[in-house]
Amino acid sequence: MIKTLQNTLKQDKERFTVPKSVQDIIPIRRIWPDGVFQFGSKYSKTLRFSDINYAIASKEDKTAMFLSYSELLNALDTGSTTKITINNKRLDRRNFEQEILIPPKGDDLDGGRKEYNAMLLDKVTDSSNSVVQERYITLSVHKKNVEEARAFFDRTVHDASSRLNHMDSRCEELDAADRLHILHDFYRVGEESEFRFDLRENMKNGRSFKDAICPDSMEFKKDHFIMGGKYGRVLFLKEYASYIKDSMINELTSLNRSLMLSIDIIPVPTDEAVREMQNRLLGVETNVTNWQRRQNANNNFSAVVPYDLEQQRKETREMLDDLTTRDQRMMFAVVTLVHLADSKEELDSDTETLQSIARKHLCQLTTLNWQQADGLVTALPLGLRRIDALRTLTTEALAVLIPFKAQEIWDRGGVYYGQNAISKNLIVADRKQLLNGNAFILGVSGSGKSFSAKKEMVSLALSTDDDIIIIDPESEYRPLVEGLGGQVINISATSPNHINAMDMEQGYGDGENPVVLKSEFLLSLCEQLIGAGKLSAKEKSVIDRCTAQVYRDYIRSGYHGAVPTLQDFHAELLRQPEKEAQDVALAIELFTDGSLNTFAKPTNVDTNARILCYDIRDLGKQLLPVGMLVVLDSIFNRIIRNRGLKRNTWIYIDEIYLLFQHEYSANFLFTLWKRMRKYQACGTGISQNIEDLLQSHTARTMLANSEFLIMLNQAATDREELARLLNISDNQLSYITNVDSGRGLIKCGSAIVPFVDSFPRHTRLYQMMTTRPSDLVA
């Protein structure tokens, strides 16, 4: 027998004692606050790691993930054992409600909150997502004392964490309370929210930590156990196919039941493994030689070596070759699975389902008879292994049992965006936690772009005090804005509503000279009015001088009193002696004193509403470029004011490609986009014309640098552009190809997750958000 395996089996051997209480069934002897558990001379430590997008990755990406996981297995320390666990745990309903449901505030929006909460509860009461998955890696080692064990864990935990992080899997060490919480949720299914544990308080009162997690009763039968009011069964993988698909573990853990699947791994030093395989090969060759000698003695000189001997020789040579030339390691492994049910009948049915999945992969998943207690301890993420049905595998063969499936997005306090199309779990993201909170919502007409944006607005309006500002070129947001108690400002040449293009808040310029920044804005405005590139150097100097003179008294008064207007600016130009000043004044007269002077008068609308919509549908071709600049500058003023109040601002720009058709509004938006995070703001661009959008270098840069994207159904050319820009695989592209409204991909930071979303149509919120003619008629 291999020395490492022999030592491990010897060290793991424990003296059996008959348990006198339910607490005695839990084999933990001692715990420390940092999460180190002791069992005899063995110590263990557990990490929790997140899932990654393996199921929908491209073939090349899957290969890269597989190789990275193989490297993790190869790096396992030969002096320890490792357990990789997938935990299907029941969703903690009370904790879920605290994290995502919106509490009432006693205002006019409580009706909307009630509808929104009902929608969320419908999503999680659906049987397909009442279970959530967690993944753990438990390292265990035999040491003389806890100090030696901690020194070992400091090294190995850091190495495992860094390798998992390299695979984009977030990793965290679990402390004692975290580990006990996992055990509590398993032993006491249905009581997840009742876990309370304080190690110091327990020590002070002389209570055992086992009292906080143990079930009320535990009874072990031949092929199952009864725990509290639940039935459970432990299975193990007895027979392995010659070729196993990498989806088997995912399929086994897709059962919507409380279950844990664990893979115990004992790595073998390469020199021992090579020596063992050389001895095995020598034994096989000896058997072949003896067989041939017997045939020769019978004068049978042309006999062919029997198939079974030839196969033994071939497999042994292949494994020896793997160990010596392909950087493979020898591992001993055992796969155990424990699942729970409400009744014996349900348990038997679930067992048959699991066994049929294994049979589909030509493997045999067998019940542990008379070993249910040992199997349970082995399946839980404790660090113990009491099942000796070990299988010899290479790194590559073991890596096929890969524990990854689909990346999840769940940010505490975030916004609900839909359900993961693979796992059916809710997607909850907080854009403010990203490197920047800027976003784009992209899709063909009818794919649900506006609805996705409105749904986010509704969530923010109901759950936060943040400000929401919308630029609406199609006049479609009025029902929602007014329904949420906001204000819509119609802007056109004939509208009585006016926004002063020269409004300036205190703090404009972010510490820089505000007049300089406003001068740049007015230069852009004048060039937009007169024509790009038509302002001479002298005219620019005159504009800069007049800007400073117009604002002098206003700034000296501490930004109090009447704010200058474009009409004041026009009058100041006329007072200048230079001919260039008169030329500029004449050129902009149409927009200051003429029929298009809607932005040349004092602001006469309330731009302080918490939810504000600028309706620019009727601006007209001549006023649109100027109107875009003025509205963006007005929004910039609002963002500055909100930053002083420590209030977040959310900006939504529908049909954003319109802004990129005009150089100055595009440049102003680009500058604003870069500053959003600094000003506690998040910008969202909405567009269906992606090909046109990406023709602008400015738009392409903004899109590439936005951390959050919602991609709905896309046209063929747009899909190709997005795939190149965002490195989206063909498998992922299938989720934005000829799909129904409300389906697509969400890019959140580095994660790209397929999603599906639907909203109950009978609700008032839906009627406020929908733009479908059939819904509106109804």
Please describe what each predicted stretch is.
Residues L726-A778:
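Conserved P-loop NTPase
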Residues S452:
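Hydrophobic positions on the alpha1 helix immediately C-terminal to the Walker A/P-loop
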Residues G485-I489, T698-M711:
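A short helix-turn-beta junction within AAA+ P-loop NTPase domains corresponding to the substrate/partner-engaging
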Residues M1-F404:
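Extended, folded cores of ATP/NTP-driven motor/assembly subunits in large transport
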Residues I52, K59-T78, K89, T253, ...:
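P-loop NTPase motor domains
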Residues K449:
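Conserved lysine of the Walker
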Residues S459-I469:
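Post-Walker A helix-loop "phosphate-sensing" segment adjacent to the P-loop in P-loop NTPases
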Residues I441:
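Hydrophobic anchor at the beta1->P-loop junction of P-loop NTPases
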